């Protein structure tokens, strides 16, 4: 049959071993640790389940689970999920860590939203000169640089477990290493509390984007304590036995961990059947929820409800630790077919350990555990199997003596605790007592464990080993099938010696036994009435065997105490001969009012404290010491009444003579104290209902508690699930023998009375400690019935135990190597006097059971459970992958962050806007004419604008000199033939600007150099182009003088006869008509206008034009006319620019002869001639002054470089607008978007600056466009079609709705809505609907393509570009680019 398991139910068995400590110290430790543990912050909760990438479980220090961090681990969350916004003023940080790299790394860090400043953190530095530093970061609000508050130099920590604590208190920082103070450093800080902004982040194993080294290695504990005293309290040597983990390093403790095999066999039905008694619900400590979470149990944890704890420790540093990895498998074994039929009530536990169980002291706390599955126990008998457990192969036991019985009492009291109910859906109202038991007894080594003197038969109990009773109800329905046909299961062991306790303080031993459920063994039925007799002052056990029913009839009479022995030495000499048995001690009786013990019955659970059996670490027996002085009253027991002292027993046989010791003062026995006040009945809390187990989903917001569904039919047996979280404390109930005083008062009056099934009331609060009672009278002498031989004498004091335990290789304790600890036995001591009055009594009887409470709400999700088995693969313990959770609603807008750091160098800026028209310049001074020698002919200059004609010396035809005319300025000597000269107009130097207003005529400039001879064909062509409209009729001119002959011109003629002026003629083809009589000079004509060119974008001012060539009849030009409409370059522009040589050759047929060509790529100059091109030689370079604006492009079309099919070529730039384009391919979340937009815009010939349509860590999306142009300019595509009315309208909160019929083009002219190059029609933006950056959804500032990281994007199918959809950053989506300002220079 496959093993049966209940969902959410787990059988766990752990053994508790510890080092001796007094009971007051144990009690004090528990209180301190409970106080210190409240409100601590466990930072390992950041890791979560399932584990992140590069994080895994490993076996950690002491066998606990730990987390292994690889190089790629990235654990971080918003700090507000774990850390309070206002941090503790004083605090402590506890760490258990094992680095695997010499580079150190950050253990944890709380940073600002930009992950640049560490507010609080711990870092390990790299290894330098055999040391490392532990660095504490503590940065107060307002600082923009991480501050190192303290740094401690420690030895290299790599590849070994290290335990340290950092304490920040007042003006000091203290480092504790292995519970010892390492050093202190002064710490200056302001009185202002450390506060974290709401957008702060907390990281584990790294520090975000700060650039600090990541931690690689194993991390087991990382806890922040609000009380800075907590680490010191947990490390107190007096409290080490109560600690839940070792304070020192396991490697250096020297305590060998020997894990004993535990087997279970079915024993004879004659073995004792023990009925467990459920303890009342104990208050749940904060650590109960952590027992199966995979976390180490914090120090000082003593209380538990679902398991007993193995504590073992080094004698040097003394704190125990829980071993939760020693149990290899826990599974059921088929029971008796008769009792198992269908109900499964007879399932056994078969616990097989393949490892050695750590054992540094003898003893197992008996842990009765009652578990309930989904059973109705009203009609199910609970008799049946009994499970006994024992450990094997220890070589020697330990015998506690009288001076250590107080510690023994504390040990036994704690180990008997942890009786727990594990509620499922069970009602225990009808459970018949004493039927189904699984008990485990750990027997001593070779001899049965004894505690004090007894009658010749005794009870196996506390000191060496106690028993564990497990009552189970697994999935039982009220079938009525009896389960008492199963024989008990008994596990035995073969030790060499027993662990016994000698006579001692009865008060302490009574306190020990009252908290320990003792179990009878034999064939007697449970519930039989105890034998009559005097009160039982002290529970005892026999050294060798179980008590039989016949022997029980003779117990109850007191024996006389042995004679007083002399004080022995310290026990450090050589071992002496064996000591004979001492005199008979007092016998056990029935109805021992203070012992918490009754025949055939169990006792109450005690106060609920769980104390390890450290008291059993003792040496071999030494000589008995004298009776000590009366000690101070011990800490009151919670459920014990001390019985009256017994009469002295008969003298036992004399022991071997020991060294004589001084006689001690006899002690005085006190009377029994008054019974304590009965506690008030407490109200029972509601039972919690178990919610349906859901598949783990992605991390989402916590949902409301789920409702419990109806029970379905039994399904197929599935694999065992991981351990569930601890349930709430169950209600106290009367089970087994039906005790009403489950607090352990020892009442045995109702042992044999069957109890009616009724609801169980919750246990009332514990009463306050009462005043010390008066000294009692000496009790009556008991009957002089000889008791069994007394135990051996007490051991010597252990002084060098830690050094002697290093080489232990077998058994619980191997003292063969410690001969110096064994002293010779001493003489028997005299009986002591009555002791002091007893302390206040225990809590009163339990009230009547209350009615069952309502089902509680579903509990919170538990921590990850510890994996206690190696039989089941890890993947079977983990649930199936959950469905993705719902996306959470966008969070509120965060507060305005602090000023950012200085950014990187920006992209090249756009050209500046044209300046305003300058003020009208003043008239310049006349130029000084300096006649110089004629220079060499210069290279041909570029064509210039027609110059103003200042002097007309003559026409191209010879004209005789007119003597009545004034001589022109700077003309050649009269009568000498020369070429036509022209004088330029002196102008003001200005910057590039808009067309200016009409300026005043400048003064006459200096005479220019002679020009080259003109070609007639060129001249005719040029004059035809310069043909103007008909001028006004001129006045009749006077007869001209005979002109000189100009022999340098090819065309000349004789002077004509004077004629009358004729009427105005039609427009002629030539400038000069036939020669007529000279007329009067005509007035200047109106300015001429050229034929308007095709409209085009405004171009820069052209270079100077060719020289004006005028005929004799041309009048002086008028003032400059208004600027004409801009046009594309026409054939009349004699200077044209091409991109390169190929472009010039392809367009040669479009260029007329005489046109100058400038090549942009090579900066060369050519002139078009008849058969081709001729290259012109240019002079030296004259650099442009630094303060001059850059020259405009020679072409007036900024988009002419786009390929022919590009729709941008037809874009209309006449109206101001901002252009929106897309990158030429899709991109994932890891992209240098701004650089791509700039680069692709330049490649497309767009001169303005384009920015990515994305939010960034430095800028919100809504602020990319220049502020002055967010409201006035439309947003258009590259064809000029309007997409949005203005930039601000996109961020109105409606998602940026646009007309889907207007396409969005890429820089290379493709429509992204239809082109298959963008398979996912989704646009990245990473912004809220109002254009605010969302740091959790913008692919880590567009620097990652990780699948686990998301960014916001908008599907084009919605007709919006700001729709709020989250996509994985690994997707390749559309990236848009926006022109961030209107650039007029690029479009002139």
UniProtKB/Swiss-Prot annotation:
Prolines at the third position of the tripeptide repeating unit (G-X-Y) are hydroxylated in some or all of the chains. O-glycosylated; with core 1 or possibly core 8 glycans. Contains chondroitin sulfate. Residues 733-763 are annotated as: Nonhelical region 3 (NC3). Structural protein that stabilizes microvessels and muscle cells, both in heart and in skeletal muscle. Restin potently inhibits angiogenesis. The gene is COL15A1. Residues 1-27 form the signal peptide. Residues 1133-1388 are annotated as: Nonhelical region 10 (NC10). It holds the Pfam family Endostatin. Gene3D superfamilies: 2.60.120.200, 3.40.1620.70, Mannose-Binding Protein A, subunit A. Belongs to the multiplexin collagen family. This is Collagen alpha-1(XV) chain. Keywords: Angiogenesis, Cell adhesion, Collagen, Developmental protein, Differentiation, Disulfide bond, Extracellular matrix, Glycoprotein, Hydroxylation, Proteoglycan, Repeat, Secreted, Signal. Residues 764-798 are annotated as: Triple-helical region 3 (COL3). The lineage of its organism: Eukaryota, Metazoa, Chordata, Craniata, Vertebrata. Residues 66-249 form the Laminin G-like domain. Residues 1014-1027 are annotated as: Nonhelical region 7 (NC7). It comes from Homo sapiens.
């Amino acid at each position: 049959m496959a093993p049966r398991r209940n969902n959410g139910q787990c059988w766990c068995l752990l053994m508790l071993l510890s080092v001796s400590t007094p009971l007051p110290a144990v009690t004090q430790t528990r209180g301190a640790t409970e106080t210190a543990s409240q409100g601590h912050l466990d930072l390992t909760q950041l890791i979560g389940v399932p584990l992140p990438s590069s994080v895994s479980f490993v076996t950690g220090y002491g066998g606990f689970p730990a987390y292994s961090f690889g190089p790629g681990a990235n654990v971080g969350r918003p700090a507000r999920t774990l850390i309070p916004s206002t941090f503790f003023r004083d605090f402590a940080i506890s760490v258990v860590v094992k680095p695997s790299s010499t580079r150190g790394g950050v253990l944890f860090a709380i940073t600002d939203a930009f992950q640049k400043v560490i507010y609080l953190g711990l870092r390990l530095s790299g290894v330098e000169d055999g040391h490392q530093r532990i660095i504490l970061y503590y940065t107060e609000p307002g600082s923009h640089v991480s501050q190192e508050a303290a740094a401690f130099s420690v030895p290299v920590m790599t590849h070994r477990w290290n335990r340290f604590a950092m304490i920040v208190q007042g003006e000091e920082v203290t480092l504790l290493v292995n519970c010892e103070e390492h050093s202190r450093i002064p710490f200056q800080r302001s009185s202002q509390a450390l506060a974290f902004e709401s957008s702060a982040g907390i990281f584990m194993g790294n520090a975000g984007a700060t650039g600090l080294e990541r931690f690689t290695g194993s991390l087991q504990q990382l806890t922040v304590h609000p009380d800075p005293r907590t680490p010191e309290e947990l490390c107190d040597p007096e409290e080490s036995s109560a600690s839940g983990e070792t304070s020192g390093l396991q490697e250096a403790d020297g305590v060998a961990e020997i894990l004993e095999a535990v087997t279970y066999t079915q024993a004879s039905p004659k073995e004792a059947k023990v009925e467990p008694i459920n303890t009342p619900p104990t208050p749940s400590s904060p650590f109960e929820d952590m027992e199966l979470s995979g976390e180490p149990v914090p120090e000082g944890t003593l209380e538990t409800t679902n398991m007993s704890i193995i504590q073992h420790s080094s004698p040097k540093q003394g704190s125990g630790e829980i071993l939760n990895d020693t149990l290899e498998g826990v599974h059921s074994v088929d029971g008796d077919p008769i009792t198992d039929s269908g109900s499964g009530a007879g399932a056994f536990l078969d616990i097989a350990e393949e490892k050695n169980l750590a054992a540094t002291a003898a003893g197992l706390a008996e842990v009765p555990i009652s578990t309930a599955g989904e059973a109705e126990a009203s009609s199910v008998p609970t008799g049946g199997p009994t499970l006994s457990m024992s450990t094997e192969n220890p070589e020697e036991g330990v015998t506690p003596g009288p001076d250590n019985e107080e510690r023994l009492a504390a040990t036994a009291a704690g180990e008997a605790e942890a009786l727990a109910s594990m509620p499922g859906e069970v009602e225990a109202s009808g459970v018949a007592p004493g039927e189904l038991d699984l008990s485990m007894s750990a027997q001593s080594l070779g001899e049965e464990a004894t505690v004090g003197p007894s009658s010749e038969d005794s009870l196996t109990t506390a000191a060496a080993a106690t028993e564990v009773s497990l009552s189970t109800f697994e999935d039982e329905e009220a079938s009525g099938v009896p389960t008492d046909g199963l024989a008990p299961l008994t596990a035995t062991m073969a030790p060499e010696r027993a662990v016994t306790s000698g006579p001692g303080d009865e008060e302490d031993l009574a306190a020990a036994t009252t908290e320990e459920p003792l179990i009878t063994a034999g064939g007697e039925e449970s519930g039989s009435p105890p034998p009559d007799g005097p009160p039982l002052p002290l529970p005892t056990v026999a050294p060798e065997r179980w008590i039989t029913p016949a022997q029980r009839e003779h117990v109850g009479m007191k024996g006389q105490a042995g004679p007083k022995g002399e004080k022995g030495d310290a026990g450090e000499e050589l071992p002496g001969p064996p000591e004979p048995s001492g005199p008979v001690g007092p016998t056990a009786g029935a109805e021992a009012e203070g012992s918490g013990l009754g025949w055939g019955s169990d006792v109450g659970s005690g106060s609920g404290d769980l104390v390890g059996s450290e008291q059993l670490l003792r040496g071999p027996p030494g000589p008995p010491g004298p009776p000590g002085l009366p000690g101070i009253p011990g800490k009151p027991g919670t459920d014990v009444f001390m019985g009256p002292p017994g009469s002295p027993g008969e003298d036992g046989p004399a022991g071997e003579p020991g060294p004589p010791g001084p006689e001690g003062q006899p002690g005085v026995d006190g009377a029994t104290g008054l019974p304590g006040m009965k506690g008030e009945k407490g109200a029972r809390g509601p039972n919690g209902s178990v919610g349906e187990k859901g598949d783990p989903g992605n991390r989402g917001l916590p949902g409301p508690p789920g409702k419990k569904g109806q029970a379905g039919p039994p399904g197929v047996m599935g694999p065992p699930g991981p351990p569930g979280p601890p349930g709430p404390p169950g209600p106290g109930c009367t089970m087994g023998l039906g005790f009403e005083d489950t607090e352990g008062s020892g009442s045995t009056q109702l042992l044999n009375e069957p109890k009616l099934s009724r609801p169980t009331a919750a246990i009332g609060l514990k009463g306050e400690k009462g005043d010390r009672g008066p000294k009692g009278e000496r009790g009556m002498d008991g009957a002089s019935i000889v008791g069994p031989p007394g135990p051996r004498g007490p051991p010597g004091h252990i002084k060098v135990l830690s050094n002697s335990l290093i080489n232990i290789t077998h058994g619980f304790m191997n003292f063969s190597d410690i001969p110096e600890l064994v002293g010779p036995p001493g003489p028997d001591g005299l009986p002591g006097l009555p002791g002091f009055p007893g302390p206040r009594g225990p809590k009163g009887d339990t009230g009547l059971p209350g009615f069952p409470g309502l089902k509680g709400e579903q509990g919170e999700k538990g921590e990850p459970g510890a994996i206690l088995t190696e039989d089941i693969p890890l993947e079977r313990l983990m649930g199936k992958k959950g469905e993705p959770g719902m996306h959470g609603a966008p969070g509120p807008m965060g507060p305005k962050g602090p000023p950012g750091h200085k950014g990187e160098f920006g992209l090249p800026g756009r050209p500046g806007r044209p300046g305003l028209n300058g003020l009208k310049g003043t008239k310049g001074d006349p130029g000084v004419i300096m006649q110089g020698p004629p220079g060499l002919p210069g290279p041909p200059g570029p064509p210039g604008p027609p110059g103003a004609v200042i002097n007309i010396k003559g026409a191209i035809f010879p004209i005789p000199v007119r003597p009545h005319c004034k001589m022109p300025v700077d003309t050649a000597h009269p009568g000498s033939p020369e070429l036509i000269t022209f004088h330029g107009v002196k102008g003001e130097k200005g910057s590039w600007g808009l067309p200016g207003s009409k300026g005043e005529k400048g003064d006459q400039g200096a005479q220019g150099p002679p020009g080259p001879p003109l070609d007639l064909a060129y001249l005719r062509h040029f004059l035809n182009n310069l043909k103007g409209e008909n001028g006004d009729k001129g006045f009749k001119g006077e007869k001209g003088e005979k002109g000189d002959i100009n022999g340098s011109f090819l065309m000349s003629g004789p002077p004509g006869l004077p004629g009358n002026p004729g009427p105005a003629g039609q427009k002629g083809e030539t400038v000069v008509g036939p020669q007529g009589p000279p007329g009067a000079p005509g007035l200047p004509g109106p300015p001429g206008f050229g034929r308007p060119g095709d409209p085009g974008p405004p171009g820069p001012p052209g270079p100077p034009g060719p020289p004006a060539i005028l005929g004799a009849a041309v009048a002086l030009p008028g003032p400059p006319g208004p600027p004409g409409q801009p046009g594309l370059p026409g054939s009349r522009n004699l200077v044209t620019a091409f991109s390169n040589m190929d472009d010039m050759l392809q367009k040669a047929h479009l260029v007329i002869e005489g046109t100058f060509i400038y090549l942009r790529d090579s900066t060369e100059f050519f002139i078009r001639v008849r058969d081709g091109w001729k290259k012109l030689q240019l002079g030296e370079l004259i650099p442009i002054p630094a303060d001059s604006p850059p020259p405009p492009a020679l072409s007036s079309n900024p988009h002419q470089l786009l390929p022919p099919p590009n729709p941008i070529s037809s874009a209309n730039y006449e109206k101001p607008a901002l252009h929106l384009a897309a990158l030429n391919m899709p991109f994932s979340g890891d992209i240098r978007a701004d650089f791509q937009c700039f680069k692709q815009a330049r490649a497309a010939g767009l001169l303005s600056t384009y920015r990515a349509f994305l939010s960034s860590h430095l800028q919100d999306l809504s602020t990319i466009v220049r502020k002055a142009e967010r409201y006035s300019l439309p947003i258009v595509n590259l064809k000029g079609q309007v997409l949005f009315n203005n930039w601000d309208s996109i961020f109105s909160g409606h998602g940026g709705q646009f007309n889907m019929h207007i396409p969005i083009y890429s820089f290379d002219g493709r429509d992204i809505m239809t082109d298959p190059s963008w398979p996912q029609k989704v646009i990245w933006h990473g912004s809220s609907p109002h254009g605010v950056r969302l740091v959790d959804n913008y692919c880590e500032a567009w620097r990652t393509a990780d699948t686990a990281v998301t960014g916001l994007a908008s599907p084009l199918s919605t007709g919006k570009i700001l729709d709020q959809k989250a996509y994985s950053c690994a997707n390749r989506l559309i990236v848009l680019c926006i022109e961030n300002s209107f650039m007029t220079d690029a479009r002139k």
